[in-house]
Amino acid sequence: MMKTFMKKILLLLGSAAVFCAGMPFQVLAAEAGSEAAGAVPLALCIPFAGLLLCIAVLPLVKAEWWEKHQIHAVVLWSLLFIVPFAVRYGSGTALETVLECLVGDYLTFIVLLFGLFCVSGNIGMEGDLAGSPRINVGLLMLGTCLSSWIGTTGASMLMVRPVIKMNYWRRRKSHIMIFFIFLISNIGGCLSPIGDPPLLMGFMRGVPFFWSLHLMPVMALNVAVLLFVFYWLDRRAYRKDIAEGCKPDISKPGTEIRILGLHNLIFLVMIVAAVILSGVLPGMVAFQNEAGQVRGIRLYGEVKLSYPALIEIAMILFAAWLSFKTTNSEIRRKNHFTWGAIQEVAVLFIGIFITMQPALMILKAKGAELGITEPYQMFWVTGALSSFLDNTPTYLVFLTTAGSLGFSSGIATTLGQVPVAMLEAISCGAVFMGANTYIGNAPNFMVKSISDENGICMPSFFGYMLWSLIFLVPVFLMDMLVFFL
């Protein structure tokens, strides 16, 4: 199964590379790259919108076809961006743009997901487990607290299977996983640079490591409100399940709750350490050349795989390998572990990363011209764009914009002085509003896929957005009124 999956990924990469290699190099990559960054036509964003529509609509109308042909849809929409882009700016620029997003962003993204998916799949629980409203609130609170210290992806992968297992007997449980995404996969990651990649980028640009603790009041209010709403919803669903005869199987008295594969926490710490190193090593002299640039393996043009990224990838893959070598396969069987979820995410997100490049180029070129000067504006614009685009470059665009506004006080970053309220708004917008869609943050789609695999009927792409519109947007309005006006 994994061999077939790798062949499909290579098909996509090969299609792009062969096309770019076969075209005449109309312009020098460096020159065309600067032109592309400043004048990308809006029409080149159509493939990104088309791919999102496929993800949203096809599982509803052609589920079996979509499951078999996801890779072909990804190849189609990717080429519909790459071909016109190469014709307009030259195949050199097209190849460099695609390689930059794949090597600079997608590779570390998918390796991190893969490592956490493998390690968490080797950690299990057994015993008399029965999900009740109070227990579920406790689980969500625990996962939310973990998110800032092992990352939203790490906490999501660690907690998703125990939460599913405790609620296996429930008939109404999709709301549990939706609030899981709201809290553990997103909002909980705002208190440290480890929590979410945008904050790690902020740390690399001079924001103090523990500055994110300033976001504690905003996070506490959001978590308190959402947990209160969740408890009310879950209590109603729980009572209906009980009334309809749903009961947990606790027929084995004396069975203690046990955590299986506990040694895998060591490998989880290895992965977290790899992420931290990826943010620290680029600032060390040993990893910089004479010009102050991060050293790496040059692949093509200005594209290179940096040594810190290479170390991160090696550490994560080694941790995943150790996890599988040292854990009994029976634990994975009890966890209903399959490769389906990571394969789906890997295929879809390679297309998302490629096709969203024009939108990111336009944002980088025009972001400073939007006239955004107030914290509440930063909060909403950063958040709205982070719901659909990669929240890390979105965060950097608006951090750069804030640093260029000429403030004389605030947090001293390498991009300029940024007022505390402005930085709080940008950080909260990028981290919190990743919860608005399945593609807003890395773990969202993973949680959905694992839930689907385990028989939980998760809402469609637009169905999930309706949930976020009803439950998250009012909370974000409250954030604006209390903290950012």
What are these regions (language model features)?
Residues 65, 172, 191-192, 210-259, ...:
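Juxtamembrane and boundary regions of transmembrane helices in multi-pass small-molecule transporters
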Residues 32-44, 65-72, 94-107, 209-218, ...:
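Interfacial loop-to-helix junctions that mark the boundaries of transmembrane helices
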Residues 84-86, 147, 157-172, 176-178, ...:
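Membrane-interfacial helix-loop connectors
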Residues 1-29:
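N-terminal secretory/membrane targeting signals
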